[in-house]
């Protein structure tokens, strides 16, 4: 059996590692680099990947694709995609299925196809080093990637000719890399992962359980559209504005100039991590009637920090939520690990140190830790490494839509995976022969506010009154965080299932706000829940009253029947509205209108039972029943209660 390689498929750079004996090793690419730019370029006669693609970007900006990971598993209409369209020199196009694809030389291509080119380069790098064919890999994804984005990453692996043995979360992989060579007691670590395009925070407990290293993720959170690329954009905007002030020329319409500006901004940002000031000098950036123009701007570290401070602050809110979800306070965190190239920025390091109240460790390579962790996980799967147990979690709650547009969770966020949970539901209408299972991901109580992952129908239910059929819905999440959903009619054994292969990702607003919105809108959600409960209660009352009215037949007077039917009509109208009080008052009215009918029905029932039981009652008069219990009651004063 060949080696299972570990690949960190990054937004900006990618990295590949293996386990040599019991030591992880990052493999250098053909250019000698330990990381490879995640850039793919299409020229007239070839496809370039990595450093060679990056080198020619200035002369070929519209066919050089970078930061494709930010599009993977996303819809074209997503806000973040629309924002990205304005920022990149290449063309983002709408696919037939509504996904965000790219258009290269008139040909539409899916993000997994582009990512597959980077994965092929990683695969070839490993094969050249090992001298043998590589067919299996563990690939990492941001912890906050949703189901669609994980699926798309798996697809990219398959396109690259790799069997993806496991998709694991980047912070978890980094914790594996950190924890494997650290002997010591149990500890809690916070992995702060700010990469090129995504941000994750995971709180992980590392414990020694009977000689086995156990890595348990307690909570995770993040933002899939926050990373180094955003820091670059702030600096690019600033440089373009400064140039416009000096020359009156707006560079934003010139892809060639913007590509040069992008490279210069990235270089300046890196330089400012170790120096206080740098010059951005771009001769012949453009020209007008008066001749060529040169860009020369001094940028200080303080200026860069003022441009990006809001982005760093934005990363702290997910940290707060992750701490809260894990049940830990910042003082209980033993170690802070920084992952991702953007964490080299002094401002990021100081803000994280202030937040957690301790300095982050400096012995973890932020560019390589994730790939090393993936390689360790690969060795665990192949059996080369034993005594390691990894317990990861699902980042967002998974639910189905139930009556009244309510999102009913089956699996809560931060549940350890793999996991399988079932819940029994029933029908909302009489003689309903089919149910639609609508699968959702997110934290809101209202179904429409969550991310729709897919839907399917379970048909062929035998006609029965509402509430009678028993439909068991099962959610099964595998170790890759990918979900299988099935629905089974318990009476007939009929079953329908779906592997959630949603083709879109969550937009920035959706993913960034899902958990935060759920908290901010707690009152709104509570109100909605109460309204939905009242509607369902009213619906049940209408159904029960109509059934009793039908059973009562001629025992109800014409006036009573008219009054009851009028009250039903009023209640049905109220159910359509959004006024909980109106629904409840109409329910009261219907209960009052139908009370005399109910009394007659009970009286008739009692009379029938009374006739049958009369003789027995006479025999039993004055005698206590055999099974009656004599009991003494003692009043307990409040002061005597223990």
Curated annotation (Swiss-Prot):
Matching InterPro entries: ATPase_NBD, Chaperone_DnaK, Heat_shock_70_CS, HSP70_C_sf, HSP70_peptide-bd_sf, Hsp_70_fam
Keywords: ATP-binding, Chaperone, Nucleotide-binding, Phosphoprotein, Stress response
Tree of life domain: Bacteria
SUPFAM superfamilies attached to this UniProt entry: Actin-like ATPase domain, Heat shock protein 70kD (HSP70), C-terminal subdomain, Heat shock protein 70kD (HSP70), peptide-binding domain
Compositional bias of kind Basic and acidic residues: 578-589
Region (Disordered): 578-642
Pfam families: HSP70 (PF00012)
HAMAP family the UniProt entry points to: DnaK
Protein name as catalogued: Chaperone protein DnaK
Originating species: Hahella chejuensis (strain KCTC 2396)
Gene field: dnaK
């Amino acid at each position: 059996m060949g080696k299972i390689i570990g690949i960190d498929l990054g937004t900006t750079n990618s990295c590949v590692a293996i386990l040599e004996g019991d030591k992880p090793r990052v493999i250098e690419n053909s250019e000698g680099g330990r990381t490879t730019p995640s850039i793919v370029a299409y020229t007239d006669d070839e496809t370039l990947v990595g450093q060679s693609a990056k080198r020619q970007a200035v002369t070929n900006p519209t066919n050089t694709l970078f930061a494709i990971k930010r599009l993977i598993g996303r819809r074209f209409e997503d806000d973040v995609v629309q924002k990205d369209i304005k920022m990149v020199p290449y063309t983002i196009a709408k696919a037939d299925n509504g996904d965000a694809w790219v258009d290269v030389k008139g040909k539409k291509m899916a993000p997994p196809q582009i990512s597959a080119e980077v994965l092929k380069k990683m695969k070839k790098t490993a094969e050249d080093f090992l001298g043998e064919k590589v067919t299996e890999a563990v690939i990492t994804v941001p912890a906050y990637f949703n189901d669609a984005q994980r699926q798309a990453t798996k697809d990219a692996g398959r396109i690259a000719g790799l069997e993806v043995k496991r998709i694991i979360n980047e912070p978890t992989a980094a914790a594996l890399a950190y924890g494997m060579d650290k002997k010591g007691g149990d500890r809690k670590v916070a992995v702060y992962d700010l990469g090129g395009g995504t941000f994750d925070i995971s709180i992980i407990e590392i414990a020694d359980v009977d000689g086995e290293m156990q890595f348990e993720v307690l909570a995770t959170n993040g933002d899939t559209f926050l990373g180094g690329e955003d820091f670059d954009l702030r600096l690019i905007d600033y440089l373009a504005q400064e140039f416009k002030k000096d020359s009156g020329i707006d560079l934003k319409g010139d892809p060639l100039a913007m590509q040069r500006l992008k490279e210069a901004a990235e270089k300046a940002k890196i330089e400012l991590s170790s120096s206080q000031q740098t010059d951005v000098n771009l001769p012949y950036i453009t020209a007008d009637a008066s001749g060529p123009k040169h860009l020369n701007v001094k940028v200080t570290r303080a200026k860069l920090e003022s441009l990006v401070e809001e982005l760093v602050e934005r990363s702290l809110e997910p940290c707060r939520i992750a701490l809260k979800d894990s049940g830990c306070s910042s003082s209980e965190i033993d170690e802070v690990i920084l992952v991702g190239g953007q964490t080299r920025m002094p401002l990021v390091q100081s803000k994280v140190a202030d937040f957690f109240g301790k300095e982050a460790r400096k012995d973890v390579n932020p560019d390589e830790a994730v790939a090393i962790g993936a390689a360790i996980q690969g060795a665990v799967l192949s059996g080369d490494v034993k005594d390691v147990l990894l317990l990861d979690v699902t980042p967002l709650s998974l639910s189905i839509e139930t009556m009244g547009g309510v999102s009913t969770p089956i699996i809560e966020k931060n549940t350890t995976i793999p996991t399988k949970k079932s819940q029994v539901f029933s029908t909302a209408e009489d003689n309903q022969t089919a149910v639609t299972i609508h699968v959702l991901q997110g934290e809101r109580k209202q179904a429409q506010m969550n991310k729709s992952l897919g839907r399917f129908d379970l048909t062929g239910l035998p006609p029965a009154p509402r509430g009678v059929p028993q439909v068991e819905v099962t959610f099964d999440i595998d170790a890759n965080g990918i979900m299988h959903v099935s629905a089974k009619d318990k009476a007939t054994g009929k079953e329908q299932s779906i592997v959630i292969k949603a083709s879109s990702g969550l937009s920035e607003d959706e993913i960034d706000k899902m958990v935060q919105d759920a908290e901010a809108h707690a009152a709104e959600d509570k109100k909605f829940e109460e309204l939905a409960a009242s509607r369902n209660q009213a619906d049940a009352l209408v159904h029960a009253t109509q059934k009793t009215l039908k059973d009562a037949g001629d025992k109800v007077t014409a006036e009573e029947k008219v009054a009851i039917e009028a009250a039903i009509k009023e209640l049905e109208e109220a159910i359509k509205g959004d006024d909980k009080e109106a629904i409840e008052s109409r329910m009261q009215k219907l209960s009052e209108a139908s009370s005399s009918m109910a009394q007659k029905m009970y009286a008739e029932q009692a009379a029938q039972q009374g006739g049958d039981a009369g003789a027995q009652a006479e025999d039993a008069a004055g005698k206590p029943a055999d099974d009656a219990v004599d009991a003494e009651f003692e009043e307990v004063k409040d002061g005597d209660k223990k």
